[in-house]
């Protein structure tokens, strides 16, 4: 585990974004942990979050021309990542996002920001069912000269859907692009193992990983 990944897990726990206990997911599964990126909800938290996304991009080695933030949650994530890449890595890259509803006046269309062209890196919080990412792939496919280079999310739950694969593995298979994350559940497990105060949650998270993991 890289230092930035350990720092990210600590940061997510401190912000209440990553919690341990008993949570019922939309899938109906009872999970021993819950990740809610909506709680990165202050200026300082968003700035820090952008730095973690930027570090993961640099680490991944994915080459791309433009960042894309899917509406709604991906918009501040793409903005914060673009700022962090410029300020901390000397990479001043264009970014854009989509509107859920196309505007009939003003700029018009459903895309805002830089032109969506070249290799596109999609920034989002998590991939649960993969539905949102599939919609994004249609948006990218509709733009001349644009193609997806990859997807970056905060946490890979490494969890099976209804079949044998996770939603992330299905996206990778169907679109032939990498999906990378700041951290994965395996790294969260490693963090719990090393933390005396949180180690009590390790058996439940490990059992969940064994039952539903990929």
Swiss-Prot record:
Gene Ontology MF terms in the entry: magnesium ion binding; orotate phosphoribosyltransferase activity
Gene3D superfamilies hit by this protein: 3.40.50.2020
Report the sequence similarity comment from the record. Belongs to the purine/pyrimidine phosphoribosyltransferase family. PyrE subfamily.
Reactions the enzyme catalyzes? orotidine 5'-phosphate + diphosphate = orotate + 5-phospho-alpha-D-ribose 1-diphosphate
From what organism does this protein derive? Pseudomonas fluorescens (strain SBW25)
The cross-references to InterPro entries, in alphabetical order and at most eight, read: OPRT, Or_phspho_trans_dom, PRibTrfase_dom, PRTase-like
GO biological process: any one? 'de novo' UMP biosynthetic process
Could you say which cofactors this protein requires? Mg(2+)
One GO cellular component, as annotated: cytoplasm
**Pathway membership:** Pyrimidine metabolism; UMP biosynthesis via de novo pathway; UMP from orotate: step 1/2
Q: Which gene encodes it?
A: pyrE
Do you know which CDD domains this protein is assigned to? PRTases_typeI (cd06223)
* Function field: Catalyzes the transfer of a ribosyl phosphate group from 5-phosphoribose 1-diphosphate to orotate, leading to the formation of orotidine monophosphate (OMP).
Complexes and interactors? Homodimer.
What's its EC? 2.4.2.10
- Keywords carried by this UniProt record: Glycosyltransferase, Magnesium, Pyrimidine biosynthesis, Transferase
Q: Which HAMAP family match?
A: PyrE
| Binding annotation for 5-phospho-alpha-D-ribose 1-diphosphate | 26, 72-73, 99-100, 103, 105, 124-132
Binding locations of orotate = 34-35, 128, 157
The protein's name: Orotate phosphoribosyltransferase
């Amino acid at each position: 585990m890289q230092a930035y990944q350990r720092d990210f897990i600590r940061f997510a726990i401190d912000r209440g974004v990553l919690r341990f206990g008993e949570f019922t997911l939309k899938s109906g599964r009872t999970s021993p942990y819950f990740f809610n990126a909506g709680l990165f909800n202050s200026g300082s938290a968003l700035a820090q979050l952008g730095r973690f996304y930027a570090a993961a991009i640099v680490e991944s080695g994915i080459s791309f021309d433009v960042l894309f933030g899917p509406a709604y949650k991906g918009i501040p994530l793409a903005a914060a990542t673009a700022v962090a890449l410029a300020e901390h890595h000397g990479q001043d890259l264009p970014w854009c996002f989509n509107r859920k509803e196309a505007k009939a006046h003003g700029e018009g269309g459903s895309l805002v920001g830089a032109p969506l062209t070249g290799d596109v890196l999609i920034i989002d919080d998590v991939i649960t069912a993969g539905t949102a990412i599939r919609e994004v792939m249609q948006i990218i496919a509709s733009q001349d000269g644009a193609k997806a280079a990859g997807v970056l999310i905060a946490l890979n739950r490494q969890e099976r859907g209804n079949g044998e694969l996770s939603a992330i593995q299905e996206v990778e298979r169907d679109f032939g692009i990498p999906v990378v994350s700041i951290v994965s559940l395996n790294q969260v497990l490693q963090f719990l193992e090393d933390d005396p105060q949180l180690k009590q949650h390790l058996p439940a998270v490990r059992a969940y990983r064994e039952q539903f993991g990929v």
